[in-house]
């Protein structure tokens, strides 16, 4: 089963086409990762999946229906998005920010309910941020803040969670912390995770499904072990490398080369 499908999807701004005639299927209940060079359209594609950018042509299909034929409230109850570098209102506490995830369920007839409170508390527990609930968000570390933002998307209680570079500007320890959390949410709670990552090796380790975006379309898609090879890295990133098995996780491991090749280093030694 698929969570999100694109059919002949073309995206752009004004006269510039960013994505052209893209057909992909992102599996339900899995972790999917979009990879590609800077400016290739990964973030643009994620915006279209979240109904934040209308296609120039084609469609994004959610639950068997064109996402742009569904109401904003209906889409917000099916998927949540965490953009790059979100800003929290000054002075807002962790619990107040996480509570904003319940906004799609509020209207003038339905105010804050016991269910809303329960979902917020559950999201805090799932992300290990319940002990931080009364602290200001701007007083937290980078890893803590990212977990709080993820908690807000969980409070929204959607089947699909979209994340645009959730590890950006985090140190390595916090990158692993965030990615472990996302995988746990997928495996233990059945969330469909779709995210953009720049680190190829972490993408291979955490992804069930991978889409390589290049030349305005999907250059390859499938399990990392099936699609990631030296030819793909050369084409998509214009980078020479060797792909070897990760000795611990048994996923593809990319060893990139710069101007100095391995044999040159060996000769110098």
Swiss-Prot record:
Main localization category: membrane
Residues bound to ATP: 36-43
InterPro entries linked to this entry: AAA+_ATPase, ABC_transporter-like_ATP-bd, ABC_transporter-like_CS, P-loop_NTPase, Siderophore_ABC-ATPase
Database matches in Gene3D superfamilies: P-loop containing nucleotide triphosphate hydrolases (3.40.50.300)
UniProt key word Transport: yes
GO terms for MF: ATP binding; ATP hydrolysis activity
Any one GO cellular component localisation term in the record: plasma membrane
GO process terms (BP): achromobactin transport
Coiled coil feature spans: none
Domain ABC transporter: 4-240
Keyword terms of this UniProt record: ATP-binding, Cell inner membrane, Cell membrane, Ion transport, Iron, Iron transport, Membrane, Nucleotide-binding, Transport
Locations listed in the record: Cell inner membrane
Membrane protein topology class: Peripheral membrane protein
UniProt similarity note: Belongs to the ABC transporter superfamily.
PANTHER family per UniProt: IRON(3+)-HYDROXAMATE IMPORT ATP-BINDING PROTEIN FHUC
Function statement: Part of the binding-protein-dependent transport system CbrABCD for uptake of the siderophore achromobactin. Probably responsible for energy coupling to the transport system.
Name under which the protein is recorded: Achromobactin transport ATP-binding protein CbrD
């Amino acid at each position: 089963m698929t969570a999100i499908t694109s059919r002949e999807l073309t995206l752009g701004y004004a006269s510039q086409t960013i994505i052209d005639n893209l057909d992909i299927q992102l599996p339900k209940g899995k972790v999917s990762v979009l990879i590609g060079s800077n400016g290739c359209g990964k973030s643009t594609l994620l915006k279209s999946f979240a109904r934040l950018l209308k296609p120039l042509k084609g469609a994004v299909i959610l639950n068997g229906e064109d996402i742009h034929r569904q109401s904003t409230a209906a889409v917000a109850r099916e998927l949540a998005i965490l953009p790059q570098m979100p800003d929290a209102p000054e002075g807002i506490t962790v619990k107040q920010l996480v509570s904003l995830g319940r906004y799609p369920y509020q209207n003038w007839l339905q105010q804050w309910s016991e269910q809303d409170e329960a979902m917020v508390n559950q999201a805090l527990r799932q992300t290990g941020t319940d002990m931080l609930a009364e602290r200001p968000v701007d007083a937290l570390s980078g890893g803590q803040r990212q977990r709080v933002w993820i908690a807000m998307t969980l409070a929204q209680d959607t089947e699909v969670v979209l994340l645009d570079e959730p590890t950006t500007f985090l140190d390595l320890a916090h990158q692993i912390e965030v990615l472990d959390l996302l995988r746990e949410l997928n495996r233990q709670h059945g969330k469909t995770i779709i995210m953009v990552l720049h680190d190829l090796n972490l993408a291979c380790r955490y992804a069930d499904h991978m889409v390589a975006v290049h030349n305005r379309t999907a250059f390859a898609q499938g399990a990392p072990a099936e699609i990631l090879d030296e030819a793909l890295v050369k084409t998509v990133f214009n980078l020479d490398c060797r792909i070897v098995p990760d000795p611990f996780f048994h996923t593809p491991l990319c060893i990139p080369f710069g101007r100095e090749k391995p044999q040159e280093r060996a000769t110098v030694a």
